[in-house]
């Protein structure tokens, strides 16, 4: 049995379970009092369930979900849909650390628009010389700097999509360690090529991509996954950055370092399971 997700609205959980029943996949709802947990009996269907869940959370009011509830005989499954919102979707998939980092990045971005990039870079950028080495926040705070609306939107969507489930399943501590370590090493790698003039959460995002993808491949029961198609796209995007065909400045070294680190951490965390299967 694999826990797929926990949601605050039990009617919503039942609607998704009913829909997956029409797809030939058995899910169960367990009410804990604080949330409704959805569990998957056969983990070989985990990737399909995760994909369908993403579509469901984007548009839970879609008629196909209501139709599935009627077909399954749960005709009251849609009575409380009006209480669901995009904010609830955001919160249901993310823990406090995921949401906190998103809020911090947004605040820093707004301040950069008001005070200018240079002001925030002065306080948050990667250490420029040895005199700043003891300003310990600089080793990770560069990840909160974003230089365009597209930059911050792209990174925060990926951070929420990958970091939220990781925090929900493995805890805030695991996400914190992965984020801090990947911010440090991706920043160090990028500084070798561009000095201290860089910023963004993309090094951490690539670490999450590597971690979630390899964890899903080696230990699907952990409940983490990244579809192979998205992983291929991410690697192609990384490669495209080296050929300057995207027409924008990209921290390529940070991306590579983050991806490699995420893969290594996932390999280490799943080593015992792989050993036990041999």
Swiss-Prot record:
Keyword Cell membrane recorded: yes
Protein name per Swiss-Prot or TrEMBL: Rhomboid protease GlpG
Transmembrane helix as UniProt keyword? yes
Which locations, inside or outside the cell, does it occupy?
Answer: Cell inner membrane
Q: Which UniProt keywords apply?
A: Cell inner membrane, Cell membrane, Hydrolase, Membrane, Protease, Serine protease, Transmembrane, Transmembrane helix
Q: Which HAMAP family match?
A: Rhomboid_GlpG
Q: What is its EC number?
A: 3.4.21.105
What's the domain of life for this entry?
Bacteria
Q: What does this protein do?
A: Rhomboid-type serine protease that catalyzes intramembrane proteolysis.
* Protein species of origin: Serratia proteamaculans (strain 568)
Molecular function terms from GO: serine-type endopeptidase activity
Q: Name one GO cellular component term.
A: plasma membrane
Q: Which family does it belong to?
A: Belongs to the peptidase S54 family.
Give the membrane topology.
Multi-pass membrane protein
Q: Where are the transmembrane segments?
A: 95-115, 143-163, 170-190, 192-212, 224-241, 245-267
What positions does UniProt annotate as the active site of this protein? 202 (nucleophile), 255
Please list the reactions this protein catalyses.
Cleaves type-1 transmembrane domains using a catalytic dyad composed of serine and histidine that are contributed by different transmembrane domains
Q: A single GO BP annotation from the record?
A: proteolysis
